[in-house]
């Protein structure tokens, strides 16, 4: 929440959330650093540890969009989205990982997207970064298992400051979205992934009160042996793709 949807350092949203939490009787701090900066990402975890003593849960949810067809997309459009979504997630998680590993406990949520899992026109940069979350999760789920660290992906759908910038979508008041676009309807899945009973290595989709699990699969395939060739591959294509 420490930055603006345009990639700047506007921290108004973070301050508002902190105020809301404190008004409700909780305790919170805002960190104004960018997740795409290594030192800034590390400072997020350092501030949390300095203030609260440790880190039990990390939800990687920083985001930015630069939507346009790949033909019209600049490499700067590509880099800024990758730096925030992919590198930012890695940087913050790397800092938190050390704390969680030593204490033998941690819950991590990475924000993926249907734009990466299923594809969405004009979002090659965003879709690639969001699919990277799945590969990142798969490896860390293995590496963290022996230390009670569980990591999952969320593929959410809701009205936010970021989605309000998507070209072609009707304007929505993100402070008072339609009920079916309320971010609060994503919350149950996030709470589950942060709980004691959280699984690991799963992708949960959540939008408008509808929840599902997405997964990659492999079929039985066919064994062509050491004599495999283009011809035998094509001859067995029906079985390979069944």
Which sequence ranges carry the predicted segments?
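The beta1-alpha1 cofactor-binding region of Rossmann-like NAD(H)/NADP(H)-dependent oxidoreductases
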Residues: 11, 15, 32-46, 75
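A glycine-rich helix->loop->beta "capping" turn
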Residues: 24-27, 47-60, 66-69, 105, ...
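Active-site-adjacent segment of SDR/Rossmann-fold oxidoreductases
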Residues: 99-102, 118, 134, 139-149, ...
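Active-site helix of classical SDR
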Residues: 93, 129
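Residue(s) in the substrate-gating loop at a strand-loop-helix junction
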Residues: 113
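C-terminal helical subdomain
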Residues: 173-242
């Amino acid at each position: 929440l420490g930055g603006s949807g345009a990639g700047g350092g506007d921290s108004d949203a973070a301050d508002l959330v902190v105020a809301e939490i404190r008004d409700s009787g909780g305790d919170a701090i805002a960190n104004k650093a960018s997740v795409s900066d290594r030192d800034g990402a590390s400072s997020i975890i350092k501030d949390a540890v300095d203030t609260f003593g440790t880190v039990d849960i990390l939800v990687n949810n920083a985001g930015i969009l630069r939507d346009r067809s790949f033909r019209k997309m600049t490499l700067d459009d590509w880099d800024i989205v990758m730096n925030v979504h992919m590198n930012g997630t890695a940087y913050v998680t790397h800092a938190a990982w050390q704390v969680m590993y030593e204490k033998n406990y941690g819950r991590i949520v990475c924000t993926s997207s249907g734009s990466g899992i299923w594809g969405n026109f004009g979002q090659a940069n965003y879709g690639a970064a969001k699919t990277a979350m799945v590969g990142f999760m798969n490896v860390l789920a293995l590496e963290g298992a022996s230390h009670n660290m569980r990591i999952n992906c969320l593929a959410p759908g809701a009205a936010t400051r970021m989605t309000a910038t998507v070209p072609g979508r009707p304007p929505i008041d993100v402070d008072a979205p339609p009920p079916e676009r309320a971010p609060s309807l994503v919350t149950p899945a996030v709470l589950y992934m942060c709980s004691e009973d959280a699984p690991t290595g799963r992708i949960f989709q959540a939008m408008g009160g509808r929840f599902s699990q997405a997964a990659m699969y492999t079929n039985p395939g066919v064994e062509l042996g050491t004599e495999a060739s283009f011809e035998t591959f094509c001859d067995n294509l029906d079985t390979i793709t069944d």
